[in-house]
């Protein structure tokens, strides 16, 4: 076998390979001999089918399989011998002439082909003991618990009809029907009947609910307002509209006492138990946000300390996925790049940078895991699948079966488990200091970071 490197440019390498026809033929013949003991043909006893007969029947297909396997094995051997870590599947170019291909299949010509390989660069990992990271810390206060319970109470609040002739007040629930027009013309999704709205809840577009204060049952008003400039329906964003609105029922909120009886309505024994449950839920919510903030800071540090050229094919693949998501969301929301104060060209540059960052961080995390023996066990993956299955009661077996039959789906389960294990490994080595912040600051930062790569 002859292997000649014809290109070594950055992360791209190309080779010209030639494998003697005799070697390929010998491998194919060995397969036919092995096939002799497995195949069953009428007129022949098991294991007694002549190889020459098998060659007439299966010779071409066996030769094709042999060539495919030889090319795959040769490519992997080339990478192994040179210490290459492949960034993707090698790209093989076979002879273009039909006669050349037929001669190779007939064993008359050597197997000659070229292959292009893109490799992952060697990564020099930073000393994680030098990392200094800040973790925001927020304690769950009694006020947080009380506020959360009040929200629960508001969600479970009952309403009763006001007396005849009563006017709607802020906090009342009003049943309305409306027809919306823009420039005197009805518009799609601008009309609805029997809509329940609590005045002051800001459930409707700005300015709508305020104009319903003082309305009575059976009364009709024309509500004049404007759609926000960032409204999700681009066709309506920023436009003035009028809604002919009729109220059919005015209901006043009933007082609700937060006590042991209220807790029992929720299936708990007493108010203290409700407070404990809510505190635990808030603690878990805060912990997730704090963890995400710390993880983001760590990924930023890894990004800053590991600058290298990522394999272009991986960056392109990641960019295509990101771009597809972005453009699909824009089409769904009927947005344009101009609406986002940018151009398509500028957006492509921005999202390609995001794709490059993601690929580099993925390679860094993978390298850290490989060099430090970090693995995700089958048991950990199974527990994660079970957790996902339990989120859709009644379909647990179906979801379990789906993951067991789809290696790609299982890989998507494994990826975040592996990433979090590597993150934990680095955090054990880094210096992490805690900083007290307000709940508002924690979730403000958390929301901002959730929109970034």
Curated annotation (Swiss-Prot):
SUPFAM superfamilies: FKBP-like (SSF54534), Triger factor/SurA peptide-binding domain-like (SSF109998), Trigger factor ribosome-binding domain (SSF102735). GO terms for biological process: 'de novo' cotranslational protein folding; cell division; chaperone-mediated protein folding; protein transport; protein unfolding. It is found in: Cytoplasm. GO terms for molecular function: peptidyl-prolyl cis-trans isomerase activity; protein folding chaperone; ribosome binding. The keyword Coiled coil does not apply. Its EC number is 5.2.1.8. Gene3D superfamilies: 3.10.50.40, Trigger factor ribosome-binding domain, Trigger factor, C-terminal domain. Pfam families: FKBP_C, Trigger_C, Trigger_N. Keywords: Cell cycle, Cell division, Chaperone, Cytoplasm, Isomerase, Rotamase. It comes from the Bacteria. PROSITE patterns: FKBP_PPIASE. It catalyses: [protein]-peptidylproline (omega=180) = [protein]-peptidylproline (omega=0). Residues 171-256 form the PPIase FKBP-type domain. The keyword GTP-binding does not apply. One of its GO terms (cellular component) is cytoplasm. Consists of 3 domains; the N-terminus binds the ribosome, the middle domain has PPIase activity, while the C-terminus has intrinsic chaperone activity on its own. Belongs to the FKBP-type PPIase family. Tig subfamily. HAMAP family: Trigger_factor_Tig. Involved in protein export. Acts as a chaperone by maintaining the newly synthesized protein in an open conformation. Functions as a peptidyl-prolyl cis-trans isomerase. This is Trigger factor.
